[in-house]
């Protein structure tokens, strides 16, 4: 847990959604959330990092509570909060949410689940989300695909794709694909801290186990993220819309879900 805390406390999220694939992730996540959330909701953004989604949702007219484990991330969120998107930001833990029963319209778990390698902890996080949700309240949970690193290593994304020839990297992705456990090698200090990578089916099963009604799973970046020269195409409006149309059409196809680095599962209490 210290590795995870230090990773985020040292600013891992600062700028991440404003560069590279983070831009696609941010755009698509907002697009998906917009289908369910407009304004006037009480939203608990649990594990929401530096508040990128919290700020956006607050600007839409929601009462947003950012509850984040890393102290420096909370302080960054407070220091960079704009007047027109005010939200509550405080330290907290997804396993023990400091909020009353049935007090939120929406709970976002778009960060904590990556780092709960113990299944019991993941079920506890889902149970806490259900506890604080009002009747028929919405939960959106994010997962990282256990095939993401493997797909990245084999893809045309980036300039060099010789990772599978590195035994250290290869052993890392073998662990991810077979057990879901991501153990960051010391040779790759900028990789995400120790995590649990999963599948949408596994996450849906865990969510249903704590009596949520699972509505659907949606791929975030989908199959477009390894497009050659993605950054250039994304800057071109016509190309960007074509890419987005592709991912929208395929976003719920089970056969495509594992190709997406991130996915969201939508559920109701």
Question: Where are the predicted features?
Answer:
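A short glycine-rich, Lys/Arg-flanked "PGG" loop and its adjoining helix->strand segment in the class I
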Residues: 123-135
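Acceptor-substrate binding/catalytic loop of class I
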Residues: 116, 187-202
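C-terminal lobe and adjacent flexible extensions of AdoMet/dcAdoMet transferase-like proteins
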Residues: 206, 210-269
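Class I SAM-dependent methyltransferase SAM/SAH-binding core
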Residues: 44, 52-96
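A short SAM/SAH-binding and catalytic strip from SAM-dependent methyltransferases
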Residues: 106-120
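A short acidic, Gly/Pro-enriched loop at the edge of an enzyme's catalytic core
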Residues: 95-107
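Conserved class I S-adenosyl-L-methionine
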Residues: 1-39, 44, 52, 56, 138-176
């Amino acid at each position: 847990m210290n590795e995870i805390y230090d990773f985020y406390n040292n600013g891992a999220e600062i700028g991440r959604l404003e560069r590279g694939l983070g831009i696609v992730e941010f755009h698509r996540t907002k697009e998906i959330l917009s289908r369910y959330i407009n304004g006037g909701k009480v939203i608990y953004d649990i594990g929401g990092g530096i508040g990128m989604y919290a700020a956006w949702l607050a600007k839409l007219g929601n009462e947003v509570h950012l509850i984040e484990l890393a102290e420096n991330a909370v302080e960054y969120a407070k220091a960079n909060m704009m007047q027109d998107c005010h939200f509550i930001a405080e330290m907290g833990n997804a396993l023990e949410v400091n909020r009353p029963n049935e007090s939120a319209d929406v709970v976002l778990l778009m960060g904590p689940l990556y780092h709960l390698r113990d299944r019991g902890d993941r079920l506890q996080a889902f149970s806490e989300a259900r506890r604080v949700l009002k009747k028929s309240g919405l939960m959106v949970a994010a997962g990282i695909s256990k095939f993401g690193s493997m797909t990245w290593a084999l893809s045309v994304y980036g300039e060099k794709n010789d990772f599978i020839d590195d035994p250290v990297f290869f052993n890392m992705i073998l662990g991810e694909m077979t057990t879901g456990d991501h153990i960051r090698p010391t040779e790759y200090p900028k990789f995400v801290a120790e995590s649990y990578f999963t599948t949408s089916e596994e996450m849906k099963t865990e969510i249903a186990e704590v009596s949520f009604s699972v509505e659907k799973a949606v791929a975030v970046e989908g199959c477009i993220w390894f497009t050659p020269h993605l950054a250039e195409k994304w800057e071109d409006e016509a190309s960007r819309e074509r890419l987005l149309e592709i991912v929208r059409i395929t976003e719920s196809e089970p056969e495509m879900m594992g190709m997406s680095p991130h996915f969201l599962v939508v559920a109701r209490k």
